[in-house]
Amino acid sequence: MKIGMITDSLGALSFDELLDTVADLGIERLEFAGGNWSQAPHLALDRMLDSAPARQEFLAKLDDHGISISALNCSGNPLHPGAIGERHREVTRKTIALAGLIGVERVVMMRVVRVDRATPMPIG
């Protein structure tokens, strides 16, 4: 068994500090958030999509620390109507595209469905 965590739980750390910390703790797998409800503190989604060298550097740093990616996460509300939903759908599409580019087979997401207009929904 390998122990993992989502990187948002150490969101105040830089990417390099995150890697040092989790390696010191014996954590071997990380789930990186690409956006939506997360601020994505450790994954520059657009930069990674646009730059093969950025992807290679990211993966090399993980490898140098003995860490692999368990999943990318894009939890949000892509079913929300209007601009919020469109923004979340865009991040979802980009996260899935990045997963393909870096060989990650798992993308974590959740959907939120409004039961009725009186029910408040989380938005971000």
List the predicted regions and their residue ranges:
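Extreme N-terminal starter segment of soluble prokaryotic enzymes
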Residues: 1-4
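Active-site beta-loop-alpha junctions enriched in small/polar residues
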Residues: 6-10, 33-37, 74-77, 112-114
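Residues that form or flank phosphate/diphosphate-binding pockets in enzymes
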Residues: 13
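Catalytic domains of carbohydrate-active enzymes, especially glycoside hydrolases
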Residues: 16-38, 98-106
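Active-site acidic/histidine proton-transfer and metal-coordination neighborhood
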Residues: 17, 55-57, 61-64, 78-124
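Conserved beta-strand positions in the central sheet of alpha/beta enzyme cores
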Residues: 31, 71-73, 108
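Glycine-rich, positively charged N-terminal anion/phosphate-binding segment
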Residues: 33, 41-63
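N-terminal glycine-rich cofactor-binding segment that shapes the pocket for flavin-like pterin cofactors
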Residues: 67-69
